[in-house]
């Protein structure tokens, strides 16, 4: 049994269905194994965003993602997407309903949503996403995120948005320390983030790593994705082992199951082989994920007991 906290809906679209809808094999458009940069990697989202406008498509892709999670033995997932990317034909209400309808067809996996603000959006559009998150909080949506081109839109410039997020008591996570330096992670910490997407470049600063440890801030680490975007050139250079050994709270995630052509089972296998992580480590990563999830304390307890029963 596994828990996944960092997973993008539009980066995890079923290839067979996408190919069927396009009338051709679209594997090359959806998989970005040799992207070489985050901005290049993000180009693989163009087709999914086009396909995720129709409500039937949205429901079907969501259902197939839930089936994929079930096959990967995931019992809880937080799936993120930007609501404003999918409203060419429909309202946000209809889009969210279609996603939840698709997810609910697979009763073995509990899935909550995280809305993403985008770095390249205007402040007005991101404020709209904050308003939408407020409206849907507790109705399938559990938090807000900031995603997109980190290198060209620096984290520190979004301070006002996160002041608004905090003012509205919205739980949040922030993509940081992926395509930009440890300063980006420091900015996320300054905003009060308890969870950081990727965050691997924190390793550039002992002080930042120390702050993560003392404040109990968790990193949503996505190893294969980091290889694809060339955050690290080889898995052996990934800082995950150093971070775990130092005492940083780490969770393991896929980021984008289709774009990175991966599953949690694959991620675990890679980490097992490269860093000799064992079953106890993976249990701990999953317990970290439960503790750092945006679930209620009661839901966390239930999930923890499920995991412990299964791993024992």
Which residues does each predicted region cover?
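Metal-cofactor-binding active-site regions of metalloenzymes
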Residues: 1-170, 179-184, 190, 194-195, ...
